[in-house]
Amino acid sequence: MTLSDLITRVRSYTRDTTGTLFTASDVKDFINEAIDKLRQIKELENIKHLSNDSDVIVLLPSQYHYMTAVYSASRCFSQDEQHYQAQTYMDEFMGLFSLVELGIKEGTISIYDENGQIIRDTHEPDGVENVYFT
């Protein structure tokens, strides 16, 4: 989805089809804030912010692009003090975030760079070695 598509999706979620409630700048900033959240996942740390209407989210599989619009809708509702709606959309985003994170770790979701190569976190977590009972 392009940035323009994502903004349209946010406007649909927030029932702001005329663009009178939330500025395009705020919506775009919240979409980029969602991208910042996705950067917490090691394999997605190189996702770039969207600045032009034709920009597309790279690295993240296309079926998950809409989750940035879900996050943005949550922030818009929060800004408008519609806390129930804000929490509902944030819960949906966090569920999707966990699904993506787990899918990447389990290997069911593959992340590809611009060259078509799979991105994997090869760093092994720290552990304790048992040297007494071997």
Role assignments for model-derived ranges:
Residues 1-59, 87, 101-134:
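Conserved short "hinge" loops at termini or chain/domain junctions
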Residues 31, 69-70, 83:
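Hydrophobic alpha-helical segments
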Residues 66-78:
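Short, hydrophobic/amphipathic alpha-helical patches that form generic packing surfaces
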